[in-house]
Amino acid sequence: MTVATAQARTAPQPLAYLKDLVLLSKPRLSGLVMITCAGGMWLAPGQIGAARAVLTVLATAVVVGAANALNCYLERDIDARMRRTRDRPLPAGRVDPFVALGLGIAAPAFAIPILSLAANGLTALLALVALLTYVLVYTPMKQRSATALFVGAVPGAIPPLMGWTSVTGGVDAGGLALFGLLFAWQLPHFLAISLYLREDYQRGGLRMFASVHGERATRLWMALTTILLLPASLALVPLGLAGTGYAITAAVLGLALSAYAISGIGREGGRWARTFFLGTLVHLTVLFVALFLSR
């Protein structure tokens, strides 16, 4: 086999390389952010033009994708030690780390001004706060403290508030209720992840909640935060953001998830936590469908 043939076989194919660049943005997470941002717009009082709405949602996704790319850059050595992440583009060597760094810096420099023009300055500022909190605070904090759980929930809860402020131009009770709902939802969701991936996180040297506080304490916190999620989801009703159908749906979902969380306090092993994690995804999906239908 000639050198040229070997190089041809090992050279990255354009479509595969493009796919890896997209993977840096963690597209499933970015897609969820687009949905929650659009949900904030849908629920907000007032109107925003279709073109401005599309630009706002897309620019929000770009900022989130950039934050994820920077996270991949900063955690590339950690990802290489973890089974779940070692095949990501950077630890696998398919993308140069400085490409991820460049995209992570250039993309928000382009998208945040667009948010300011398509929506308003407040929405752009919220995007910047989410980006900086995720990259400069949450990402390094995961290596030092389990309280990173609560810090990381802040940027994750900002997108629906951005959708709200893009329409209203201000932060009020409705926007804060949406922020509170997403903040509360993330706590049991990520506690479950820290539990069923505890060994992998320990392998990577990350001080996630279950790795630091142990399995029983994590299950207790999962039950507590799931119970607190119920009033957070129902808070939208007295504010006039949702009707009776949503209230019934939120109550049933919240009680069912709380019962399952409580049932896991005395259990052991990661299978239950994995099932609970999937349950939180179903919970949020059905909740947002009910929200959309209630308007």
Swiss-Prot record:
Gene Ontology biological process terms, A to Z: heme O biosynthetic process
Record-linked InterPro entries: Protohaem_IX_farnesylTrfase, UbiA_prenyltransferase, UbiA_prenylTrfase_CS, UbiA_sf
Catalysed conversion reaction: heme b + (2E,6E)-farnesyl diphosphate + H2O = Fe(II)-heme o + diphosphate
Compartments where located: Cell inner membrane
Annotated membrane topology: Multi-pass membrane protein
Keywords: Cell inner membrane, Cell membrane, Heme biosynthesis, Membrane, Transferase, Transmembrane, Transmembrane helix
Highest taxon, organism lineage: Bacteria
Membrane-spanning ranges: 31-51, 54-74, 98-118, 121-141, 147-167, 173-193, 220-240, 245-265, 273-293
Any Gene Ontology CC annotation: plasma membrane
Enzyme Commission code: 2.5.1.141
Enzyme class: transferase
GO MF, one example: protoheme IX farnesyltransferase activity
Keyword Metal-binding set for record: no
UniProt pathway annotation: Porphyrin-containing compound metabolism; heme O biosynthesis; heme O from protoheme: step 1/1
The UniProt record lists the keyword Transmembrane helix: yes
Family: Belongs to the UbiA prenyltransferase family. Protoheme IX farnesyltransferase subfamily.
Function: Converts heme B (protoheme IX) to heme O by substitution of the vinyl group on carbon 2 of heme B porphyrin ring with a hydroxyethyl farnesyl side group.
Record-linked NCBIfam families: cyoE_ctaB (TIGR01473)
Additional free-text comment from the UniProt record: Carbon 2 of the heme B porphyrin ring is defined according to the Fischer nomenclature.
Name of the protein in its database record: Protoheme IX farnesyltransferase
Organism name: Anaeromyxobacter dehalogenans (strain 2CP-C)
